[in-house]
Amino acid sequence: MFSQAQFNVTMAEEDRWKQWYPNMEMIVNNKGPKLIFPELNFNITGLEEKSRYVVLLSIEKYDNIRYGYRNGKWGPSKVRHATKKEQEIKYFLHPDGTKLGKELMKETIKFDTVRITNHKKFMDKDNVFFVETMHKYVPVLTVKNITNVESANHSMRMEVAQFFPVTVYNQESIGNWKSKFHKNSTYGNRLDGGNKRKNTDSSEERTSKRSKNETEIAVSDILQVASQSENYNESTNSGRLQNEISSSIHQFPSTSYQNQYPHAYPTVNTPPIYVQQFTALFDEIHNQFDPKTKQNRVAKNVQYLSSVPQFAINQKENIHQNAPDYPVSQFPNQYPYGSYPYYYPYFQSSQQFPHLNYSMNNSIYSDSSFQSSFSAENSYFDENGNPIHYPYYSSN
């Protein structure tokens, strides 16, 4: 047996971690779990050579503080506080399983497949850890002697590897530095297509001033900026949009956004939301429908979005706060302004709105009852429920 003083763990990539200690940042977003870089590779000493061990990794909160990035520095947030809910610790068993102590001490123990996410829907895999943005985390290595079951487990917090999960690098130099060693590390740079929303105390301050309903929809870090695809033609404002969304959905309409993405706006006065964007939003936040059958998708979406007054522009008095689950074909009569004004056209939109380029085949709303409520010539409804057709918005 060995004492705790004999047992020691060091990071194989310690020099890289030290370059940004204690303010390393890791990108997380809604596109899927992200690899941790620098990698979590360890060297262990002080084991019994003939005993067999298992090695486990956990990603745990460093403390119970909610942080903010302000004036170029990380520090405790002055606006929002961490939740009191205790973290559920998850352990990931090293894929090699059990090994002799002498084997473990000769090699570098690599956890290079470990990923992190800020979306619980990706938590079905053993190597994926859930983290919250604006909190600090630290990897913890646990070594268990299974030959001598009475031997105590040995755990060590790797202080040098503490990090902040973020949706975009606050310290852009981190992204530039990572890109030199890891080809997939540039996503979070603002200049490389990353989310333009800063994780700052000042942004939290703006969020805290919103109404309750607005805050529920404008959940931080759940969405990403709608961007044009490689097929976008600037001269004609045409081309397929990627199925992405904006994290600043509560700030629309935005003059700067219109100038940057003129093809994204059929008209200045129309709520700038896309049909497929609604899908991702409610998939992620409310989960109010069966993703396989897609039943009640439209009704549920309308029910939630009808409670958000800023989307209606100057028609707040016409918003229906609790739209029930009526069949979709009844919406024009039952809720002339509480439903369709939030949806952009998809029915024969290749002729009407070529810059959206949605088709019947890829539309989530393809059931006949919903299609029948639209016409090929009119794709929008005014406050009285009358179908109208708005002109395109152009930057010219």
UniProtKB/Swiss-Prot annotation:
The UniProt entry's GO biological process terms, in alphabetical order, are: cell fate specification; positive regulation of DNA-templated transcription; regulation of transcription by RNA polymerase II
Gene Ontology cellular-component terms for this entry are: chromatin; nucleus
Which GO MF terms does the UniProt record name?
DNA-binding transcription factor activity, RNA polymerase II-specific; RNA polymerase II cis-regulatory region sequence-specific DNA binding
Q: Which residue ranges carry the DNA-binding annotation?
A: 11-192
Instruction: Look up the domain of life of the source.
Output: Eukaryota
User: Which regions are flagged for Basic and acidic residues bias?
Assistant: 193-215
Any transmembrane segments, and where? none
The record's CDD domains line, in alphabetical order, gives: T-box
Which keywords does UniProt give here?
DNA-binding, Nucleus, Transcription, Transcription regulation
Stretch list, region Disordered = 185-215
- Where does this one sit in the cell? Nucleus
For this entry, the protein name equals: Putative T-box protein 39
Native species: Caenorhabditis elegans
Highest classification ranks of the organism: Eukaryota, Metazoa, Ecdysozoa, Nematoda, Chromadorea
GN (gene name) = tbx-39
